[in-house]
């Protein structure tokens, strides 16, 4: 398993050593993703593949293919995948399909941590959240009680600035297309314009390209534009969508 964070089990507990070791672990995880592919392994409600064991098998297959990390949704999936792969697991909990639906509250984030996520992904927009907390308040609460890394899912440049100001470990363009939670269309590709703006304004920050990365060339273009790492999901792990793309092409 990915090493994660260490707490001395023997001898006198040293706060400074503990903090230094956690800082190193954080840095090692983020560095391990640089220039790499993160694969999102998710199935939508009601689909044949929506089962934790199935998701874990797919995650392991992606690891064998070269994925540097797995991004997954739901507590059972996080736990199952964490038990199957050696690479970091980015966990989230989707609630609904509109508004703030990616790990919308502190409660959801805590549950992802307890399920075994090495990194917790959450919506970084300034939209209202079910528990009334702001994004910044949620991040601060997580920092005060956990050593988990935080991935900020952003829609706009303002969201990216907010995430950087909150010292999030990974900052992603996940929501930039402003599409529904269930979106399997094959269309415009990743948001290279936002990616370039973010990497120019924040050089050295781990800006992740996510959203509509449908081909290897899309992934390469994102890295060339300055992405720290690239997330692809549907094009790799969602056979219903992939099949529909082929079928539609034959009908044109």
Predicted features by range, described:
Residues 37-41, 70, 89-93, 120-122, ...:
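Hydrophobic faces of well-ordered beta-strands that scaffold small-molecule active sites
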Residues 15-114, 150, 158, 162-165, ...:
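Conserved N-terminal beta1-alpha1 strand-loop-helix module at the mouth
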Residues 49-51, 71-87, 99-107, 124-142, ...:
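Active-site-adjacent beta->alpha loops and helix N-cap segments on the catalytic face
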Residues 12-26, 44, 48-49, 191-252:
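Alpha/beta catalytic cores of nucleotide-metabolism and tRNA/nucleoside-modifying enzymes
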Residues 3, 8, 12-13:
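N-terminal polybasic/positive-inside topogenic patches
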Residues 85-89, 115-119, 144-147, 165-172, ...:
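Glycine-enriched alpha-helix->loop->beta-strand junction motifs that scaffold or abut catalytic
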Residues 27-32, 113-114, 144, 199-201, ...:
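Solvent-exposed alpha-helices and their adjacent loops that cap or buttress functional pockets
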Residues 42, 115-129, 171-183, 225-245:
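Glycine-rich phosphate-binding active-site loops on the catalytic face of alpha/beta enzymes
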């Amino acid at each position: 398993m990915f090493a994660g964070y260490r707490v001395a089990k023997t001898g006198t507990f040293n706060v400074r050593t503990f903090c230094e070791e956690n800082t190193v672990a954080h840095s090692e995880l983020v560095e391990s993703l640089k220039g790499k592919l993160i694969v999102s392994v998710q199935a939508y409600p009601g689909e044949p593949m929506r089962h934790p064991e199935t998701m874990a098998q797919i995650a392991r297959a992606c690891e064998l293919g070269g994925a540097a990390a797995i991004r997954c949704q739901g507590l059972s999936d996080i736990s199952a995948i964490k038990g199957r792969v050696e690479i970091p697991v980015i966990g989230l909990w989707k609630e609904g399909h509109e508004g703030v639906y990616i790990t919308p509250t502190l409660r959801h984030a805590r549950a992802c941590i307890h399920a075994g996520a090495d990194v917790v992904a959450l919506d970084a927009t300034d939209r209202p959240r079910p528990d009334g907390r702001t994004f910044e308040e949620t991040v601060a609460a997580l920092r005060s009680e956990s050593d988990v890394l935080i991935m900020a899912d952003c829609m706009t440049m303002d969201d990216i600035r907010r995430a950087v100001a909150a010292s999030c470990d990974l900052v992603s363009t996940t929501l930039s297309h402003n599409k529904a939670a269930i979106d399997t269309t094959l269309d415009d590709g990743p948001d290279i314009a936002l990616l370039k703006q973010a990497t120019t304004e924040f050089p050295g920050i781990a800006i992740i390209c996510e959203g509509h990365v449908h081909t290897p060339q899309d992934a390469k273009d994102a890295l060339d534009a300055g992405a720290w790492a690239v997330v692809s999901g549907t094009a790799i792990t969602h056979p219903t969508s992939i099949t529909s793309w082929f079928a539609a092409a034959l009908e044109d």
